[in-house]
Amino acid sequence: NKAILPVLWQLFPNHRYLLDTDFEVNDLLKQTGYAVKPIAGRCGSNIDLISAQDELLDKSSGKFVDRKNIYQRLWCLPNVDGKYIQVCTFTVGGNYGGTCLRGDDSLVVKKESDIEPLIVVKDK
């Protein structure tokens, strides 16, 4: 549930691991560009990416169109060889469980986006 994100931003403003997030579009979000995300959305569904010039950069469809939204500072994923890449990590039993890369031709990574090759090597 993304409703926690504006609360976290209020509790920890300018934290390096958080993006400015609000329940409405504020002046700072208008200046930087922002993502519109359904509070209870999943897998990149129903996301709009709006530039600082108020232009629609990308959008995705889905079944969460009638949900309340949050508005989050725009931070575009890095483009590697023509794909926008998202690094996903997860834990199992409180320990590192794994990492995968999701890649898509569009700015929004979705459920059907590709799983990209990844190898983890031990530090020397």
Regions found by a protein language model. Name each.
Residues 1-76:
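Active-site nucleotide/adenylate-binding loops and adjacent lid/helix of ATP-dependent enzymes
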